[in-house]
Swiss-Prot record:
This is ATP-dependent Clp protease adapter protein ClpS. Residues 1-23 are annotated as: Disordered. It comes from the Bacteria. Involved in the modulation of the specificity of the ClpAP-mediated ATP-dependent protein degradation. It comes from Brucella melitensis biotype 2 (strain ATCC 23457). Belongs to the ClpS family.
Length: 116
């Protein structure tokens, strides 16, 4: 936050009473920051079917078939792939949704988040 001090001096009633002297008025101006962003990443494994990964990308990250396939192949070939960049709360929710969905379907797919 930024602080601005304004000093006002003045005399009233002859200058020797309680109404004379210096007054400091502090005005505070809040400075907002953009929230930190987090990358949501899928990790490759040898057991989760490629079709399931594509389905996850379409369902939870609103990717079209071409983008989902491209990301899935990147995960398959490089071991990790980015699904999207979100604020902390959204990223945390996406990771939780993907992990729960993978467990429900008995796949070991891992999804993590990291600060960008």
């Amino acid at each position: 936050m930024r602080r601005f001090n304004t000093i006002m001096q003045g005399k009233t009633n002859g200058g020797n009473g309680p109404e004379s002297g210096t007054v400091v008025v502090t005005r505070t101006q809040p400075k907002t920051r953009k929230p930190s962003l987090y990358r949501v990443l899928l990790l490759n494994d040898d057991y989760t079917p490629m079709e399931f990964v594509v389905h996850v990308l379409q369902r939870f990250f609103q990717k079209n078939l071409d983008d989902a396939t491209r990301i899935m192949l990147h995960v398959h070939n490089h071991g990790v792939g980015e699904c999207g960049v979100f604020t902390y709360e959204v990223a945390e929710t996406k990771v939780s949704q993907v992990m729960d969905f993978a467990r429900q379907n008995q796949h070991p797919l891992q999804c993590v988040m990291e600060k960008k």
